[in-house]
Amino acid sequence: MELRAVDGERIADKTVLKMMREMGPRCGIRRETDYHRYNSYRGEVGETFENVLGRDFGADGPWRKMGTDVTEFRCSFGKAYLAPAYDFGSREIVAWSISKRPDMEQQREMLDGLAKAMPEGAEPVMQMDMGWQYQHRAFTGRLRGLGVTQSMSRKGNCLDNACTEGLFGHMKDEFFRGRDWDDFEEFKRDLEAYIHHWNHVRRQVRLKGLTPVEFREQALRGAA
């Protein structure tokens, strides 16, 4: 995709696979046990919501369907947590917070970024699990104020938030696997650099060879 978009070279996907077989590069396949999952479920400790999306993650444009979750990274310095706001239509990570603690301050930082990024008139549905953060009145009230509809996965059904879980899988394969950090701030800088790469550089087949930012900008121009 990069050859086509940047250099104008047209090469079939099957040709690329053939060359990879001949030259030796392989794509690593992750195992479920490779990464640690963060579980924020504490029961019904606040306001809960219906599963509005019902695993229908398809979106015909940006700012229609989104997801959020918290994922954990274990490094030599300790643990770090990422809380993103992920657009299912553009595949863009539109806001995020990287923290040593998965607390409400992290969620406030992510929501501040979401508020700055949202275009006027956007009213997306956001999928999430039943974690305690997402039941907290500070979180639910902030989303209402932004015009975002909450959609909650059923207890024990990670497939209800499969789109965001898929993002975490790609991220941990491409950014985290086989690496380690001794310093949180260095880890944070590197993860933010990867998020920039994901949004602005990494082209995706589902976006017809565009980057998430290119897709979003093209879609919004077409809707104007």
Range-by-range predicted roles:
Residues 16, 20, 53, 69, ...:
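Mobile genetic element proteins and their domesticated derivatives, centered on retroelements
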Residues 55-94, 100-104:
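An active-site-proximal beta-strand-loop segment
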